[in-house]
């Protein structure tokens, strides 16, 4: 009995220490499983189970330490925007469970989408209405553009139209936020060391938008796909040039930014190559090599 009490106390303390950016790793693992699925279903479900485990830890913190979670989200725009990855990860995980529990998975998927929009509305009220440029970070992309994960996963539930509407909403928000975040990074405001790894998020929104576009938009534009892919790869290269400096920093929870952005970049490129093959456009073999390299980097 004493051992049980000690164990429960340790578990309680461990859950208390789970940081909000854990949701980012949760999302990265869920997406990585889908990236690795063509190579190994075992790896896919290993990633899915690991992601779900992190989700249980974070959900437990929400239930057991609601005031701490409230303080984290109310007091820090980075944590508040990063928390959206929790709902993005749930959308991804619903594609794992759909073959086994289709109705429940679809209900949870809808719930995650609604929760993300609710978080978006609250974030706008809490941080955007009276925002200051120095408080703007790439995590803002997560709050507003991250909803496009619904577009990426929509085909699983045969909701292409809904996915297309959400894509256009998220892509419009991306165009606005890209200018805002870029202005912030070009401004004189210094970036604190713990927030520097967040720069990696820069590579995610364009690739996520492209993946959502390819998944749901019925009348696709080849020109738009090519332009989006070129921009996505350009942003990815820009992030890679900063990696040597970022990896020299001591560990921060913001290292979670190294996960999903790399995965979605590889996924978007692979989907682009697949689409070009479908419409009988010759794809340079070098692109397949790049997909392989980006998959390795994401892993």
Task: Mark where each language-model region is.
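N-terminal signal-anchor module of multipass membrane proteins
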Residues: 9-60
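Generic multipass alpha-helical transmembrane bundles of integral membrane proteins
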Residues: 111, 140-243
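Membrane-water interface of transmembrane alpha-helices
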Residues: 54-65, 112-123, 174-181, 237-240
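Juxtamembrane helix-loop boundaries in multi-pass membrane proteins
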Residues: 9-31, 66-92, 109, 125-152, ...
């Amino acid at each position: 009995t004493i051992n049980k009490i000690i164990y429960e106390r340790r578990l309680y303390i461990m859950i208390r220490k789970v940081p909000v950016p854990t949701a980012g790793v949760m999302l990265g693992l869920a997406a990585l499983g889908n990236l690795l699925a063509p190579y190994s279903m075992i790896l896919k479900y290993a990633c899915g189970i690991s992601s779900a485990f992190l989700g249980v830890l974070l959900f437990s913190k929400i239930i057991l330490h609601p005031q701490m979670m409230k303080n984290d989200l109310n007091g820090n725009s980075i944590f508040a925007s990063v928390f959206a990855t929790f709902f993005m990860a749930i959308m991804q995980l619903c594609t794992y469970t759909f073959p086994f529990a289709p109705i429940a998975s679809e209900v949870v998927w809808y719930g995650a989408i609604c929760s993300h929009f609710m978080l978006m509305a609250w974030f706008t009220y809490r941080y955007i209405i009276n925002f200051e440029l120095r408080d703007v970070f790439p995590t803002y992309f997560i709050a507003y553009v991250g909803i496009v994960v619904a577009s990426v996963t929509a085909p699983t539930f045969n909701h292409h139209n809904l996915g297309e509407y959400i894509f256009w909403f998220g892509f419009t928000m991306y165009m606005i936020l890209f200018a805002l975040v870029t202005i912030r990074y070009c401004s004189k405001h210094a970036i604190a060391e713990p927030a520097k790894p967040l720069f990696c998020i820069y590579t995610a929104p364009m690739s996520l938008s492209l993946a959502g576009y390819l998944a749901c938009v019925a009348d696709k534009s080849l020109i738009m796909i090519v332009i989006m892919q070129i921009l996505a790869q350009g942003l990815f290269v820009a992030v890679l040039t900063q990696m040597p400096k970022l990896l020299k920093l001591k560990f921060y929870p913001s290292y979670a930014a190294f996960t999903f952005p790399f995965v979605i970049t590889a996924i978007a490129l692979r989907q682009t190559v697949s689409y070009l093959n479908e419409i009988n456009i010759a794809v340079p073999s070098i692109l397949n090599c790049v997909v392989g390299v980006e998959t390795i980097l994401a892993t």
